[in-house]
Curated annotation (Swiss-Prot):
PROSITE patterns per record: SUEL_LECTIN (PS50228)
Name recorded for this polypeptide: Protein eva-1 homolog C
Gene: EVA1C
Protein function: Binds heparin.
Annotated source species: Homo sapiens (Human)
Organism superkingdom: Eukaryota
Source taxonomy: Eukaryota, Metazoa, Chordata, Craniata, Vertebrata
C-alpha cells in the first residue's frame, strides 16, 4: 500500500552489455596471462638446461688446483660424482707461491720433489666427493729442501657414481666400444694387483703380492690410445703398462670409462672435431667412423644430447625442477589446445551471428525465391498442341518483359488484327477468322 505523497521511484536502468563485447575483451587478458606463464616456464627451462650443461662440463673437464705450504687444498665435485685423481706434485716453485727466486736455490728446485705425493693424495681424496688436505712437508714424508717455499699441485676429474667398469686379465685383449655419435672418455685405469683382493683371473691358488702393486700410469696409456674414439682394442701386458708387481704375480687391468656424446665432448675438447675418419688400423684398433657407407639411416646429432647416466643423475639431484618442467610442458600443451578450441568456437559463433543478421535484413528473400520456383513450375506446358507449343516458343524467345514493353506489344498485336480484319472485309470474304490464325499472325 502506497502512502500519499510518496511515489515509488522507478529502478535505475542498468547498462546492457553486449555478450559479444565481453567475449572480445576477455581473451586478450587470458592470452596475456598465458604469455606471462610461458615466459616464466621458458626461463625455468633455460636455467635448468644451463645448470645441466655446467654439470656435464664439470664431469668431463680436467680440474687443476694448487695450494701453498700452510694452506688447505680443496677438491670438490658435484652431486652423484666422486674425485678421480689424475696426477699430483709437491715440490718447489717460486713462481706459484713466492715472487722472488734466490739464485742459490735454482738447482735445488729440480730435486725438491716428494715421491709419495700421488699415493698420499689418492689415499686422502680418491673416490670422495669433497677433500680438504693440509699442505705441509710432514704430510708427504721427509722434507728434501727445508726452509724453501713449496706447493701442492693436483689434477683430477669428477667421475659419475654410475660408470662402465671393465676388468681384463693379463695377456688378454681389452675391447671398449661406444654407439654411434658417442666417444670414449677414460676416467680411471689401474694395472696391477691388490694385496687382499681375490684372484679374478685364475681359479688356481697363486702367489699374492706382499703389498699393493698398482701402476696408475695405465690411465695415461689408455687416454692416449682410446680417448675420443668409438672403438679401442689393446693387449693387456707388461709391454704396454709396465710391471709394477713381483715376478709370478697375476695382474689385471681395471678401467672406468663412459661414452660421451660427440657435441659435448667437442665443446670440452675442440681437437676431437679435427679427427679424421679411418678404417681398421694395423695393430687391431678401430678408428672413428663418422659416416659409414653401409648405413642408410639418417644420422642427426641433437643440439641437446646428453649421457643417460648424467641425465638420470641430474633428475635425481633436482626432482622438483624435473617435475615442474614436466607439468609445465603438459600445461602449455593443454593451454594451446584450449586456445585453439576457444578461437574456433568464437569464430563459428560470430559467423552464425553474421549470417543471422543478413537473413534479418532481407526477411522475404526465401519466400520470394520459393514463389519464383513455383511460377517456373507452373509455366511448364501441360499440353502438346500447336498453339501451346507456339506460345511456349514465344515465351522462350521473349523471356523477360517490362510493363511498358508488354503494353506496346499488346497494342501492336491489336493493330495487326484490325488490319487483317479490314483486308478480309474488303476482299468480300468471311469476316470471322479462326482464332488460331489470328494468334499465328
Amino acid at each position: 500500500m502506497l502512502l500519499p505523497g510518496r511515489a515509488r521511484q522507478p529502478p535505475t536502468p542498468q547498462p546492457v552489455q553486449h555478450p559479444g563485447l565481453r567475449r572480445q575483451v576477455e581473451p586478450p587478458g587470458q592470452l596475456l596471462r598465458l604469455f606471462y606463464c610461458t615466459v616464466l616456464v621458458c626461463s625455468k627451462e633455460i636455467s635448468a638446461l644451463t645448470d645441466f650443461s655446467g654439470y656435464l662440463t664439470k664431469l668431463l673437464q680436467n680440474h687443476t688446483t694448487y695450494a701453498c705450504d700452510g694452506d688447505y687444498l680443496n677438491l670438490q665435485c658435484p652431486r652423484h660424482s666422486t674425485i678421480s685423481v689424475q696426477s699430483a706434485f709437491y715440490g718447489q716453485d717460486y713462481q706459484m707461491c713466492s715472487s722472488q727466486k734466490p739464485a742459490s736455490q735454482r738447482e735445488d728446485s729440480l730435486t725438491c720433489v716428494a715421491a709419495t705425493t700421488f699415493q698420499k693424495v689418492l689415499d686422502e681424496c680418491q673416490n670422495q666427493r669433497a677433500c680438504h688436505l693440509l699442505v705441509n712437508s710432514r704430510v708427504f714424508g721427509p722434507d728434501l729442501c727445508p726452509g724453501s717455499s713449496k706447493y701442492l699441485l693436483v689434477s683430477f676429474k669428477c667421475q659419475p657414481n654410475e660408470l662402465k667398469n671393465k676388468t681384463v686379465c693379463e695377456d688378454q685383449e681389452l675391447k671398449l666400444h661406444c654407439h654411434e655419435s658417442k666417444f670414449l672418455n677414460i676416467y680411471s685405469a689401474t694395472y696391477g694387483r691388490r694385496t687382499q683382493e681375490r684372484d679374478i683371473c685364475s681359479s688356481k691358488a697363486e702367489r699374492l703380492p706382499p703389498f699393493d702393486c698398482l701402476s696408475y700410469s695405465a690411465l695415461q696409456v689408455l687416454s692416449r690410445r682410446c680417448y675420443g674414439k668409438q672403438r679401442c682394442k689393446i693387449i693387456v701386458n707388461n709391454h704396454h703398462f709396465g710391471s709394477p708387481c713381483l715376478p709370478g704375480v697375476k695382474k689385471y687391468l681395471t678401467v672406468t670409462y663412459a661414452c660421451v656424446p660427440k657435441n659435448i665432448l667437442t665443446a670440452i675438447d675442440p681437437a676431437i672435431a679435427n679427427l679424421k675418419p679411418s678404417l681398421k688400423q694395423k695393430d687391431g684398433e678401430y678408428g672413428i667412423n663418422f659416416d659409414p657407407s653401409g648405413s642408410k639411416v639418417l644420422r642427426k646429432d641433437g643440439i641437446l644430447v646428453s649421457n643417460s647416466l648424467a641425465a638420470f643423475a641430474y633428475i635425481r639431484a633436482h626432482p622438483e625442477r624435473a617435475a615442474l618442467l614436466f607439468v609445465s610442458s603438459v600445461c602449455i600443451g593443454l593451454a594451446l589446445t584450449l586456445c585453439a578450441l576457444v578461437i574456433r568456437e568464437s569464430c563459428a559463433k560470430d559467423f552464425r551471428d553474421l549470417q543471422l543478421g543478413r537473413e534479418q535484413l532481407v526477411p522475404g528473400s526465401d519466400k520470394v525465391e520459393e514463389d519464383s520456383e513455383d511460377e517456373e513450375e507452373e509455366e511448364d506446358p501441360s499440353e502438346s498442341d500447336f498453339p501451346g507449343e507456339l506460345s511456349g516458343f514465344c515465351r522462350t524467345s521473349y523471356p523477360i518483359y517490362s510493363s511498358i514493353e508488354a503494353a506496346e506489344l499488346a497494342e501492336r498485336i491489336e493493330r495487326r488484327e484490325q488490319i487483317i480484319q479490314e483486308i478480309w472485309m474488303n476482299s468480300g470474304l468471311d469476316t470471322s477468322l479462326p482464332r488460331n490464325m489470328g494468334q499465328f499472325y
